[in-house]
């Protein structure tokens, strides 16, 4: 019989915090210039008219207007902002 207590290292504590990715302003909604539209890893959604892209592939609005999601090519989504008349 062992007389020493078995000491094991913890196997928990490796979970990373969620990165809060995804669409922040949906199609048909109104946005202001500079609003973040989509946070993503890679270009799941591509920038369309009046939309800029950050170094971490975040899409943001360049003007105030209405957000539009379109699929121009096979499996390629574009996010645009249209001026409200």
Swiss-Prot record:
GO biological-process terms attached to the record: translation
GO annotations of cellular component type: cytosolic large ribosomal subunit
Keywords: Ribonucleoprotein, Ribosomal protein
Keyword match rRNA-binding: no
Record NCBIfam families: L27 (TIGR00062)
Family of the protein in this entry: Belongs to the bacterial ribosomal protein bL27 family.
Protein name: Large ribosomal subunit protein bL27
Species assigned in the record: Azobacteroides pseudotrichonymphae genomovar. CFP2
């Amino acid at each position: 019989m062992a007389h020493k207590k078995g000491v094991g290292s913890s196997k928990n504590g490796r979970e990373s915090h969620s990165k809060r990715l995804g669409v922040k302003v949906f199609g048909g909604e109104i946005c202001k210039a500079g609003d973040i539209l989509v946070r993503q890893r890679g270009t799941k959604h591509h920038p369309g008219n009046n939309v800029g892209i950050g170094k971490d592939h975040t899409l943001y609005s360049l003007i105030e207007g209405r957000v539009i999601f379109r699929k121009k090519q096979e499996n390629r989504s574009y996010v645009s902002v249209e001026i409200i008349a």
